[in-house]
Amino acid sequence: MTMSRARMLPVLGAMTAVLAVLSVAARPAAAQQSAGADTSSLPAGFGTLRQDDIAVKLQYNALQVKVLPLDETVIRTLSPDSYRALHELRESKRAQVDSLLRRTGKPGASLWYVQYFNQEQGEARFSPLEVIIASAGQDFRAVDVYGLTPGFGEQRLQQREMQAGLYVFDPQVDVSQPLTITYETQRSDAWGTLVKKVDRERALIRSRAAGKE
């Protein structure tokens, strides 16, 4: 069920205030990574993929929704500039995410970047809580969502306007496996193909890095 704008904004505002207080505590280990993620053999700076190469896209009425994982094992396959941009974006919310993990007791998180773009004339509304990821037969909604652009909490877009948020999902969302992503009534299984491209790029990265030694 879609949370109404009037209900959602106070909830997110209150949660943000709580997280700000909690963020002074020690940071849990591996808070930003999915369970089992290992980047020790995957150096940064050797990838060649573009952000669109790892993005799942859905069309819902006037909205184009772009969803991509922020897991280090995935974004390290991107070109250096793209990797740096997404890595810094993820790190900008590290304190909030770590505080959320302490509060919920979860061992980690699967972090995702979700972008909404209005391609048509007039105003378009979006529902941040309607993004669902199916992993290993289970459906997951975001544990929390942090706006990355001014006005994200308004949940509306003018023509050609973009809004984006950082989504915190349960660590059981496994980016190394095929996933189904749904927004409202639209769904995509494209990650099953994209993850193969990511796997191939990982192998190439290790080869490139070995050649530099």
Outline where the language-model segments fall.
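Generic detector of short alpha-helix boundary/capping microenvironments
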Residues: 13-19, 102, 155
